[in-house]
């Protein structure tokens, strides 16, 4: 794409209108409203309301059309003239066998047309050569000076143009024989455009009226037979668009001089010269391509005459010899100088030609007569040819978008409209570039469907579509509206009454034209890219025609009606430079463009779009339409419809006409009747008296057209009996035929008597308006001296509305008068009305009241309210006198001023004294408010109110009293704000102040008579601080230490107070110390992520015996849904503050816990083993995972006797009690194996040892705060010491001592047997290696100092042996199961029962005691080995067994388990059956972590401390022998404080 050499300057924008919805509802009314403005521009644009968006109703899939082909540079008039001129010169040289080559000058193709035109303007070739003015010619062609371009132009002119001009002058034409001139570039061979052949117009195939169907009569296209017969057509067919082809088989003979005795040479074949095409195809965008190189040219021939000549064959006949005579001199001598014409075979002497030739030219030669015949053939009409390809909307859009994107090398939507506009006008003015586009124009909507919804469509319309189908802006509806003239034409005139569709692409254009019959047109762009319009107003239409005719006379000489053919453009800048006013606009999607009568318009498309257009005619068009018919008559142009027929048809039914239309039709009918009378009178004067009636409306239009002016006749026509196929209008009666007048007769539609009758009907319809207008005129002008009443004028206005009278100036005056009268009445009602609305109406001034009275008197109607207005005026004057008296009397009385103000407001009239009265009243009222606000005994006002009062004072008019009060009020506010700022600082400052400081501030601020919010807040804070100090003193001086909850509440309140409190820091330290102790106790007792609180663990489990309650609360604690610290002991928050109540409740809880666990044992013992085959579904055990314990490795809790999956709980390790200091006989001492299992519901804490608890009790003794957890810990310690004493007493009894000795003896026997027998084969690195490896990690040193117990716990957690380190034991134990025998001891029932009861009580304690394990060992030895449990534990300890379930407990799995619990709880009561079937495991118990803590804290094993069990047994045996006969005596019932002193003296 090349930039244009001349920049295009866009014309000014046309008017753009945006109607409101009210205006938009009347399309033709709105167009009539804007016509005075828009008509001056010729075109205008209308933007509908934003929400008016009609649906696109075209069937896109079935819409197929064939577009027209447009070559842009053939559209512009001046460019087409240049192309036609080049075609003529090319044809001139082609006839003589030479192709035209356009030379290049200064790297541009030489404009031959402009060169010839300038030469002619400068006086012609001879004059320029004589005066040597070729340099001036070069300058006028805008070539630079100083390069000798004038001489080059002269040579080109002499070689190419001058021979053609000599020929055009009429003299005999000969060819010049000059040497070729050198040029900067090789000449470009010119390819004739053959515009008429390739731009043939195709008439419409649609079988209805067409507004352009008669512009050009259809011409039969040349057939192949015609082409073969016509050598010129054949030549055009061969040399079509593009380079000429070589090798067509054209043969010619050489023409030589005729000599009688010369021999005929052999035939010689010569190829045609190369041809260079100036304009290529559209896809090449005007690039010039050379078909052949000039190297093939033979420069021995003349440069412009590359041709072959043919010699005449020898003829022996005498007739042929006699024909050898020169056509100029008529002599036959000098035959050797004869030259034979290849066209007509005539002979010429070379010296008889003008100018004479020195020799016979080689190649084809034609005589001047043949050249004249060829070049003078009339040009054919120019038009558009149809494309050969049929498109759908999609395929055309793809082609259009692709073309635009490729042309501009950017996306189509990013190309600015200004760039496209400049490029379009550059292309249409370019001779070199031949860009071709396609335009789907004048597509019939009746055949292809309209873009708007229509009621007679093939499918049902939605309510929205029906609304748009009936809208007046629908282009199918607008032409047939009642106010439109075209609704009275029955025929569907395509393009006028029936819309046409337009599918455009970039650069596709519509040329300068006016609408048929100079009607209105409206165009709506449905969608797509904008359409650029140019318009010229009707007043400049003839000026535009004159300019185009003057600039391109060559086109209009042959086609006078060229502008009516829509095929010619001219640059708007060119028109504007010649004084033609042009406007432009860009029509976007959803916008209308309206063209007014006889307004020339043109334009082009910015890209792919879809538009629809139609014509319409209003009443104001009728005079314009009559003028158009006269214009058509002069141009002899066909009419689309008969204007006379339209007028008569409307006149036949005047009652159906809109009144505006009736008035306009009456005027036109009157003029038409007068003209008809004149013409018929002329006919009578010619002696034509014969006449007959003819129904012209029934005849086809082509049968009633004047043969002279082509006008469609209706009222009358002149015909001849002898020439039945011809008729003329009465304006051309002399052009009918040469027959006698007696044979001619008049054909008429109406008689001269019928026409006045029709006119009278129109007059009656129109006079109804005149009569009404006379009444209105008389009423408004008061012609008879009597004013009409307001009601009479209102009746006249209603009559105009009912009878649809036009919106004339008189009606506007009437409406204006009524509007003024209504305004006066409204003002009067506002003055005299007693309603509340009267007070809301604005006051009027006294001057306005006087003007109102005057206006009511001047109106052309009478109103009875005028007397009431006079009474109001009298009252106002009396009020003025009273106001003046009040203003002059001092001092001013507030009551009198208020009374006068209220009276003035009642009058609703503002007098001049009212402003002064209002100022005095405002001053008095404000001073009264200040006085009340500062009164000592009055209520104190806030700072906001006082500030508002001061602001009000600034708006009051100044006076001495006002100024004084204003100053006092300002001083008071300054002082108050100062104290407020101090109080605010005390409240918000980071450093708090003492109560004494605050008391001083409050006391001093009390003297200010203003309510100060910050001072009040400071006072309240001080009061709260004093109350807080009193509470602290009371709680510190009580009988008992204060509870932690009370101290925390006091600390929270004290921190929020903006007062410095000395007691607060002491309380904070106490609370911090208490929390530190509580945290230390929690770490000691609670497991990691435990779901229990510390108080829950320390207190007895009161719900141990209730399956439903215990498990329900355990589940709720798992989910974090249940917290009942204050409900554990059945005490209220107040009872927890009493130590005695806590101890009593703890004792009661112990008893409930024992009873509950016995009850739970009884229930669970009835359940069968999960490993048994006979299981009762109603008594099965449910694991914490929610599944039934059946068919998998399950363990039974030794406390509650319920069953659990071994994979869902932490299981004990069999050899955790075996120590390296013992022999391997311990592997066979199965009663020492760690097989004890407590479920997560029974063992709730870490169960620390008493040594660890001692350090907590020592810290508790130092606290000056009471904690429920501390008192619970004291009770738990007392309970554990009591149980320990009873356990030691039981172990020291004779029976138990004997059993212990027997058990030791059994272990010794096992050792002896191993010494005498070969030990069993053990794998490498079995238990001894394992125990040796882990001995340093399992055995903890004995710590005597109690203060290091906590550190020992932490260290023990870090040195727990890993399960995988004892692989030898795990491999050995299965082989030893068959060697286990038992029972080892025989326990009598009297001995077993107390021990089992002690065992149960010990398991309930959340404390680890050595005696617990001793009792467990005795009970185990007194029964058979539990091989089932041992086998289960062995299976669970296998590496491949997923028993270590803690590795699978991801957070996601825990959340799913909790969700499962919650879902299972919704809407259900936790009965025993439901809970046992829906039990879930704890998400917070992590067996893997607890396993590492087990050796010290014992999650599921009651005892794993470093004290050797055999040493404990020995200690009890020694005690039987007298060393420690009564251990229980050392544990009397002690108070908590006595327990602490005992721990200091005893070593456990």
Swiss-Prot record:
Crosslink (Glycyl lysine isopeptide (Lys-Gly) (interchain with G-Cter in SUMO2)) position: 205, 229, 244, 279, 1123
Catalytic activity: N(6),N(6),N(6)-trimethyl-L-lysyl(4)-[histone H3] + 3 2-oxoglutarate + 3 O2 = L-lysyl(4)-[histone H3] + 3 formaldehyde + 3 succinate + 3 CO2
Gene3D superfamilies (alphabetical): ARID DNA-binding domain, Cupin, Zinc/RING finger domain, C3HC4 (zinc finger)
Modification Phosphoserine, positions: 300, 316, 889, 893, 1355
Cofactor remark: Binds 1 Fe(2+) ion per subunit.
Binding sites annotated in the UniProt record for 2-oxoglutarate: 439, 521, 523, 531
InterPro entries in the record: ARID_dom, ARID_dom_sf, JmjC_dom, JmjN, KDM5_C-hel, Lys_sp_deMease-like_dom, Zinc_finger_PHD-type_CS, Znf_C5HC2
GO molecular function terms attached to this record: DNA binding; histone H3K4 demethylase activity; histone H3K4me/H3K4me2/H3K4me3 demethylase activity; nuclear androgen receptor binding; zinc ion binding
Cellular component per GO, a single term: fibrillar center
Primary location class: nucleus
Zinc finger intervals, PHD-type: 325-371, 1182-1243
Subcellular location(s) of the protein: Nucleus
Classification via PROSITE patterns: ARID, JMJC, JMJN, ZF_PHD_1, ZF_PHD_2
Segments forming domain JmjC: 467-633
Catalytic activity, EC: 1.14.11.67
Primary role: Histone demethylase that specifically demethylates 'Lys-4' of histone H3, thereby playing a central role in histone code. Does not demethylate histone H3 'Lys-9', H3 'Lys-27', H3 'Lys-36', H3 'Lys-79' or H4 'Lys-20'. Demethylates trimethylated and dimethylated but not monomethylated H3 'Lys-4'. May play a role in spermatogenesis. Involved in transcriptional repression of diverse metastasis-associated genes; in this function seems to cooperate with ZMYND8. Suppresses prostate cancer cell invasion.
Subunit organization: Interacts withPCGF6, MSH5, ZMYND8, AR.
Domain writeup: The JmjC domain is required for enzymatic activity.
Extra remark beyond the main annotation: KDM5D encodes an H-Y epitope that is defined by the octamer peptide TENSGKDI; since no similar peptide was found in KDM5C, it is presumably the genetic basis for the antigenic difference between males and females that contributes toward a tissue transplant rejection response.
Protein name: Lysine-specific demethylase 5D
Species name: Mus musculus
């Amino acid at each position: 794409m090349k930039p244009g050499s001349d920049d295009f300057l866009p014309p000014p924008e046309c008017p753009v209108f945006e109607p409101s919805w009210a205006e938009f509802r009347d399309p033709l009314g709105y167009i009539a409203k804007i016509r005075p403005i828009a008509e001056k521009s010729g075109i205008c644009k209308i933007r509908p309301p934003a929400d008016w968006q009609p649906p696109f109703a075209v069937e896109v899939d079935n819409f197929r059309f064939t577009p027209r082909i447009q070559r842009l540079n053939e559209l512009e008039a001046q460019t087409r003239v240049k192309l036609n001129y080049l075609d003529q010169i090319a044809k001139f040289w082609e006839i003589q066998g030479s192709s035209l080559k356009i030379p290049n000058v200064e790297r541009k193709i030489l404009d031959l047309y402009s060169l010839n035109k300038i030469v002619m303007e400068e006086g012609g070739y001879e004059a320029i050569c004589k005066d040597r003015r070729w340099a001036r010619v070069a300058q006028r062609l805008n070539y630079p000076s100083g390069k000798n371009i004038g001489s080059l132009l002269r040579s080109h002119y002499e070689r190419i143009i001058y021979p053609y001009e000599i020929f055009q002058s009429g003299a005999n034409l000969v060819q010049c024989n000059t040497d070729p001139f050198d040029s900067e570039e090789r000449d470009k061979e010119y390819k004739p455009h053959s515009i008429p052949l390739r731009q043939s117009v195709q008439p419409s195939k649609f079988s209805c009226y067409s507004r352009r169907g008669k512009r050009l009569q259809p011409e039969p296209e040349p057939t192949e037979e015609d082409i073969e017969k016509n050598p010129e057509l054949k030549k055009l067919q061969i040399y079509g668009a593009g380079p000429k082809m070589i090798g067509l088989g054209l043969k010619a003979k050489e023409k030589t001089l005729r000599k009688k005795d010369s021999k005929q040479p052999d035939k010689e074949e010569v190829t045609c010269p190369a041809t260079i095409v100036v304009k290529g195809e559209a896809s090449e965008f005007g690039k010039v391509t050379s078909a052949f190189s000039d190297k093939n040219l033979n420069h021995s021939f003349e440069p412009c005459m590359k041709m072959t000549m043919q010699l005449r064959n020898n003829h022996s006949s005498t007739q042929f010899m006699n024909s050898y005579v020169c056509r100029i001199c008529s002599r036959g001598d000098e035959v050797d100088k004869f030259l034979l014409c290849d066209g007509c075979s005539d002979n010429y002497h070379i010296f008889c030609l003008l100018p004479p030739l020195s020799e016979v030219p080689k190649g084809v030669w034609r005589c001047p007569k043949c050249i004249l015949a060829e070049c003078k053939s009339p040009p054919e009409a120019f038009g558009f040819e149809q494309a050969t390809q049929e498109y759908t909307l999609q395929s055309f859009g793809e082609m259009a978008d692709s073309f635009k994107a490729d042309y501009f090398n950017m996306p189509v939507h990013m190309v600015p409209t200004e760039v496209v506009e400049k490029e379009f006008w550059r292309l249409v003015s370019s001779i070199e570039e031949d860009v071709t586009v396609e335009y789907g124009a004048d597509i019939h909507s009746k055949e292809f469907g309209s873009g708007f919804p229509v009621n007679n469509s093939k499918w049902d319309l939605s309510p929205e579509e029906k609304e748009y189908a009936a809208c007046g802006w629908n282009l199918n509806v607008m032409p047939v509206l009642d106010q439109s003239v075209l609704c009275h034409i029955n025929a569907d005139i395509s393009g006028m009454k029936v819309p046409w569709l337009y599918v455009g692409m970039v650069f596709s254009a519509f040329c300068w034209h006016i609408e048929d019959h100079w009607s209105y047109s409206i165009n709506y762009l449905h969608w797509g890219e904008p359409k650029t319009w140019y318009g010229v107003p009707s007043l400049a239409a003839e000026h535009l025609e004159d300019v185009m005719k003057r600039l391109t006379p060559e086109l209009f000489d042959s086609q006078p009606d060229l502008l009516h053919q829509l095929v010619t453009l001219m640059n708007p800048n060119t028109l504007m430079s010649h004084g033609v006013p042009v406007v432009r606009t860009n029509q976007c999607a959803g916008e209308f463009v309206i063209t007014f009568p006889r307004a020339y318009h043109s334009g082009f498309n910015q890209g792919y779009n879809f538009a629809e257009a139609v014509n319409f005619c209003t009443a104001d068009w009728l005079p314009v339409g009559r003028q158009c018919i006269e214009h058509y008559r002069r141009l002899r142009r066909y009419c689309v419809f008969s204007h006379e027929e339209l007028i008569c048809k409307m006149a036949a039914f005047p009652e159906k006409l809109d009144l505006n239309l009736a008035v306009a039709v009456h005027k036109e009918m009157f003029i038409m009747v007068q003209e008809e009378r004149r013409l018929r009178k002329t006919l009578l004067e010619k002696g034509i008296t014969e006449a007959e009636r003819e129904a012209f409306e029934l005849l086809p239009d082509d049968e009633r057209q004047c043969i002279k002016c082509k006008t469609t006749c209706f009222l009358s026509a002149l015909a001849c009996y002898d020439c039945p196929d011809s008729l003329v209008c009465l304006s051309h009666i002399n052009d009918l035929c040469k027959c006698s007048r007696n044979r001619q007769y008049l054909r008429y539609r109406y008689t001269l008597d019928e026409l006045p009758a029709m006119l009278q009907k129109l007059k009656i319809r129109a006079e109804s308006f005149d009569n009404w207008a006379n009444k209105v005129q008389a009423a408004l002008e008061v012609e008879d001296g009597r004013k009409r009443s307001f009601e009479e004028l209102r009746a006249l206005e209603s009559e105009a509305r009912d009878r649809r009278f036009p919106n004339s100036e008189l009606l506007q005056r009437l409406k204006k008068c009524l509007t003024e009268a209504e305004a006066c009445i409204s003002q009067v009602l506002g003055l005299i009305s007693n309603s509340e609305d009267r007070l809301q109406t604005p006051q009027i001034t006294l001057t306005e009241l006087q003007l109102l009275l005057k206006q009511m008197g001047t109106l052309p109607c009478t109103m009875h309210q005028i007397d009431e207005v006079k009474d109001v005026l009298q009252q106002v004057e009396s009020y003025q006198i009273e106001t003046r008296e009040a203003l002059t009397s001092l001092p001013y009385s507030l009551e009198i001023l208020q009374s006068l103000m209220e009276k003035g407001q009642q009058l609703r009239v503002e007098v001049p004294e009212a402003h002064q009265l209002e100022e005095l009243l405002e001053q008095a009222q404000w001073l009264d408010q200040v006085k009340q606000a500062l009164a000592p005994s009055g209520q104190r006002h806030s700072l906001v109110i006082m500030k508002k009062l001061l602001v009000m004072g600034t708006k009051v008019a100044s006076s001495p009293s006002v100024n004084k009060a204003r100053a006092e009020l300002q001083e008071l506010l300054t002082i108050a704000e100062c104290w407020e700022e101090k109080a605010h600082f005390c409240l918000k400052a980071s450093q708090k102040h003492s109560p004494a400081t605050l008391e001083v501030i409050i006391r001093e601020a009390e003297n200010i008579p203003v309510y100060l919010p910050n001072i009040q807040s400071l006072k309240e804070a001080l009061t709260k601080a004093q109350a807080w100090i009193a509470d602290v003193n009371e709680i510190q001086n009580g009988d008992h230490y204060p509870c932690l909850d009370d101290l925390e509440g006091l600390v929270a309140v004290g921190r929020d107070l903006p007062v410095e409190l000395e007691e607060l820091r002491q309380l904070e330290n106490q609370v911090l110390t208490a929390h530190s102790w509580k945290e230390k106790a929690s770490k000691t007792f609670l497991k990691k992520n435990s779901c229990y609180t510390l108080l829950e663990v320390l207190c007895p489990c009161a719900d141990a015996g209730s399956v439903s309650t215990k498990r329900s609360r355990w589940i709720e604690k798992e989910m974090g849904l249940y917290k009942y610290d204050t409900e554990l002991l059945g005490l209220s928050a107040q009872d927890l503050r009493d130590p005695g109540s806590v101890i009593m409740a703890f004792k009661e809880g112990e008893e409930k816990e024992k009873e509950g666990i016995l009850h739970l044992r009884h229930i669970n013992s009835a359940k069968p083993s999960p490993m048994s085959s006979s299981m009762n579904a109603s008594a099965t055990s449910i694991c914490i995972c929610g599944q039934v314990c059946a068919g998998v490795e399950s363990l039974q809790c030794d406390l509650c006797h319920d069953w659990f999956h071994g994979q869902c709980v932490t299981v004990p390790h069999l050899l955790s009690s075996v120590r390296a200091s013992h022999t391997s006989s311990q592997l066979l001492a199965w009663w020492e194996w760690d097989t004890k299992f407590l479920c997560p519901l029974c063992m709730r804490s870490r169960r620390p040892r008493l040594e660890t608890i001692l350090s907590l009790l020592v810290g508790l003794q130092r606290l000056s705060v009471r904690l429920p957890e501390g008192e619970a810990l004291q009770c738990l310690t007392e309970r554990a010491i009591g149980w320990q004493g009873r356990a030691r007493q039981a172990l020291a009894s004779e029976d138990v001592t004997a059993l212990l000795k027997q058990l030791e003896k059994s272990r010794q026997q096992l050792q002896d047997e191993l010494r005498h027998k070969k030990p069993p084969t053990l794998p490498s690195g079995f238990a001894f290696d394992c125990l040796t490896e882990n001995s340093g990690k399992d055995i903890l040193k004995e710590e005597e100092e109690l203060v290091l117990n906590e550190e020992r716990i932490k260290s023990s957690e870090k040195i727990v042996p890993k399960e995988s380190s004892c692989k030898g034991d795990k491999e050995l134990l299965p082989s030893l199961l068959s060697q286990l025998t038992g029972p080892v001891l025989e326990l009598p029932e009297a001995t077993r029962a107390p021990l089992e009861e002690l065992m149960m009580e010990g398991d309930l304690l959340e404390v680890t005691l050595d005696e617990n394990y001793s009792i467990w060992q005795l009970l185990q030895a007194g029964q058979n080995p539990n091989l089932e449990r041992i086998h289960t534990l062995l299976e669970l300890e296998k590496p491949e067994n997923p028993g270590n379930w803690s590795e699978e407990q991801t957070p996601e799995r825990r959340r799913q388990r909790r969700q499962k619990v919650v879902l299972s709880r919704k809407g259900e009561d936790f009965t025993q059956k439901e809970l046992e079937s829906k039990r879930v495991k704890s998400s917070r118990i992590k067996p893997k972590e607890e396993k590492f803590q087990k050796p010290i804290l014992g999650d599921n094993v009651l005892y794993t401390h470093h004290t050797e069990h055999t040493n404990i047994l020995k200690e009890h045996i020694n005690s039987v022998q007298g060393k420690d006969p009564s251990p229980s005596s050392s544990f009397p019932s002690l108070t908590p404080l006595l327990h602490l002193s005992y721990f200091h003296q005893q070593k456990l």
